[in-house]
């Protein structure tokens, strides 16, 4: 019960991309027995949880769900979007314009916040962010650990500034009257 009183925990999750099955029904019930005050989400099976969720929907789909007339469970949460591999996350404003137009959405979670790598050094002392096969092993199938909006040392990447602007607390719109 370490984190049950944390104000930072607003939703419990059954996991990420782990498939369906009876174990998730049992896990949902165990979480509700443990803490019935917070909703539970799981993007692989919205039938067994308290709120709707999915990953990487299109902007058009989000706009439709924002009407409150979609065949989904509300409130709705995008559990994974804006994968920031390379130069990505440029259409966040389109997602958030739709989500903020309604009370049917309760947010979305960026994948990933920070690149997953560690300080690594060449034999001559040059420091770089190392991951996966950089350490002599090959347990991975690609560069799926350097897709955050922050570098491993927490310095911002270009995507960070897009997110900061879109997530700002105040919205300003120019009207015809200036």
Residue ranges and their predicted role:
Residues 154-178:
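Surface beta-strand/loop "capping" patches
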Residues 1-149:
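Substrate-binding/catalytic cleft of secreted carbohydrate-active enzymes
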């Amino acid at each position: 019960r370490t984190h049950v009183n944390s104000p930072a925990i607003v939703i419990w999750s059954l996991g990420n991309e782990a498939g369906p099955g009876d174990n998730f029904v049992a896990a949902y019930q165990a979480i509700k027995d443990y803490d019935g005050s917070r909703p539970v989400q799981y993007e692989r099976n919205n039938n067994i949880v308290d709120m709707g969720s999915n990953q990487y929907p299109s902007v058009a789909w989000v706009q439709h769900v924002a009407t409150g007339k979609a065949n989904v469970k509300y409130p709705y949460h995008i559990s994974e979007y804006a994968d920031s591999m390379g130069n990505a996350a440029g259409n966040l404003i389109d997602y958030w314009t739709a989500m903020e137009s309604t009370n049917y959405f309760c947010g979305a979670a960026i994948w990933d916040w920070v690149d997953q790598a560690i300080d690594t050094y060449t034999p001559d002392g040059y420091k770089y962010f190392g991951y996966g096969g950089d350490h002599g092993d090959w347990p991975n199938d690609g560069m799926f650990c350097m897709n955050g909006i922050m570098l491993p040392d927490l310095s911002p990447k270009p995507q960070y500034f897009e997110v900061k602007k879109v997530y700002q607390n105040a919205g300003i719109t120019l009207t015809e009257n200036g």
